[in-house]
Amino acid sequence: MAISVNAMRTIDHWVGVPLCAIARPIVALLDLLSKPFARSTEPKRLLFIELSEMGSAILVDPAMRKAQANGADIYFLIFKSNAASLGLLNTVHPNHIFTIDSSSLWKLAFDTLRFLVKARFYRIDTVIDLELFSRFTALLTGLCGARRRVGYHIFHGEGLWRGTMLTRKVHYNPHIHIAKNFISLVHAAFAKEEEQPFSKITISDQEIQLAHAVIDPMVKQYLQLRIENLAQQAMIPFKHGQQRIILINPNASDLLPQRRWAPERFSE
């Protein structure tokens, strides 16, 4: 049985807060012990963490391509149920995609420990936490062994406490598109000078242009025929190339109930 969204949020709060408090001094001590061996190099093996949002896994693509253009090998950690979204644009090599199975608490714990081992095996040196509110990803960021850890921080504002395990803290800007906020995280990862806070840059609309998904022509043709058949069964006039199709997703799942259509808005 899959873990519900509400259960995840409850666990993230009641378990995440004490774990962040425990992990914070441990991460600080490890940073202190490894400081004499630190090398001031640019990110070589860069991991993005975005577990629960399939849409964000697509919107972060321009940021990932920017990291690649800067010479980094990119990796991605995501929930197993959302991993298919990364295959649409194929920016991340399949062997560089790490997954966590959230279908049960035991699988979640096992895959988490397995990831922490893998992160060290692959010698991940930089990690970017794309999440805004998750303490779980904050813990993964702090404990994965990366020396350079980038993510959003509340600074002097009020909000969710996720510990202080980031080495490069970025201010989230709610007035710009999330894709631009992702670009600011990559800028912070590669910045040669410290900023407080990161990232004081201007990001153009051209920098967040999304690549087009490559779709198998046979699959596309099959779907077109299926849509025409369904339209014919419903006695709706439709022919590919003659009428347009509008896709609407009225159910945004339990992650964002605010995006759902109200039940009274549906037609019988």
Could you say what each language-model-derived stretch is?
Residues 1-268:
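Catalytic machinery of carbohydrate-active enzymes
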